[in-house]
Amino acid sequence: MNFEGKLVGSDLKVAIVVSRFNDFITNRLLDGAKDTLIRHEVPEANIDVAYVPGAFEIPLVAKKLAKKNDYDAVITLGCVIRGSTSHYDYVCNEVAKGVSKANDVTDTPVIFGILTTENIEQAVERAGTKAGNKGAEAAVSAIEMANLLREI
């Protein structure tokens, strides 16, 4: 038997957790995610957005939303750009662990759409220019995973 999630979201409800830090990037990721959800038939009224101060706060809010069982998927969007200190490494590691743990405590898929880049140019490329829009990619993953879990 094969299981495969469909890419139609007409009956899905999706939450997006987005960081306000580096909002010149995260706003593009959010636009890409919302546009993609709508293009895949998720009703705009079924898309809720929670804003958090920075990437570090994303996992807690994502976990809380996923545990509510009101959503078929939760998308996390943020942007961490390497600076001149080790802060980048700590934030990236803890955010990735936190999002992963959120998947462990609920049956709602929590999708990792957080950019971790070496510089601003890489972030811009992944927010809608050369390398596509990682927010849009996260939205496709959310739809597929939500439908796959319904099928299993």
From Swiss-Prot:
Protein's UniProt name: 6,7-dimethyl-8-ribityllumazine synthase
Keywords: Riboflavin biosynthesis, Transferase
Pathway field: Cofactor biosynthesis; riboflavin biosynthesis; riboflavin from 2-hydroxy-3-oxobutyl phosphate and 5-amino-6-(D-ribitylamino)uracil: step 1/2
Catalytic site positions: H87
Catalytic reaction annotation: (2S)-2-hydroxy-3-oxobutyl phosphate + 5-amino-6-(D-ribitylamino)uracil = 6,7-dimethyl-8-(1-D-ribityl)lumazine + phosphate + 2 H2O + H(+)
UniProt entry tagged with the keyword Lyase: no
PANTHER family for this protein: 6,7-DIMETHYL-8-RIBITYLLUMAZINE SYNTHASE, 6,7-DIMETHYL-8-RIBITYLLUMAZINE SYNTHASE DMRL SYNTHASE LUMAZINE SYNTHASE
Any Gene Ontology CC annotation: cytosol
InterPro entries membership: LS, LS/RS, LS/RS_sf
EC number, UniProt record: 2.5.1.78
Family membership: Belongs to the DMRL synthase family.
EC category: transferase
UniProt function note: Catalyzes the formation of 6,7-dimethyl-8-ribityllumazine by condensation of 5-amino-6-(D-ribitylamino)uracil with 3,4-dihydroxy-2-butanone 4-phosphate. This is the penultimate step in the biosynthesis of riboflavin.
Subunit-structure text: Forms an icosahedral capsid composed of 60 subunits, arranged as a dodecamer of pentamers.
Top-level taxon: Bacteria
GO molecular function list: 6,7-dimethyl-8-ribityllumazine synthase activity
Binding site for (2S)-2-hydroxy-3-oxobutyl phosphate: S84, T85, R126
The keyword Iron-sulfur is annotated on this UniProt entry: no
GO BP terms, alphabetized: riboflavin biosynthetic process
Residue positions binding 5-amino-6-(D-ribitylamino)uracil: F21, A55, F56, E57, C79, V80, I81, F112
